[in-house]
Amino acid sequence: MPLIGKGNQAVGDLGEQTAADYLVKQGYRILERNFRSRGGEVDIVAKDRQGCIAFVEVKTRRSLAYGLPQLAVTQRKQHQISKGALAWISKNRLHECTARFDVIAVLLQDGSEPTIEHIPNAFDLAY
């Protein structure tokens, strides 16, 4: 898909779809996408083959001019994801579940297949 003229939101949406497709191919089950709560958010909530809930942050870039996508997951962003994850767990009454925080970095460049890097357990719960 040509990226020229696409805004950041469209590129981000394409990156999230690419990440979700990747997870499904790896045997994950997507439980929810774009979960929002007061002060928190999670791009993808998925369950891996072992039953662990993965709260996944997707970072997408069109080039490496501004650095690796995964480096954009700052401490502040980790805090927002953590708040979203806790809200999702509470909403779904899964207080006894095993969970982790993953990052998927997607590099989308015109004329190339997407480059995907999945980083399981990328960070711990951030308060």
Swiss-Prot record:
CDD domains: PoNe_Nuclease. It comes from Trichlorobacter lovleyi (strain ATCC BAA-1151 / DSM 17278 / SZ). One of its GO terms (molecular function) is nucleic acid binding. PANTHER family: UPF0102 PROTEIN YRAN. This is UPF0102 protein Glov_2230. Belongs to the UPF0102 family. HAMAP family: UPF0102.
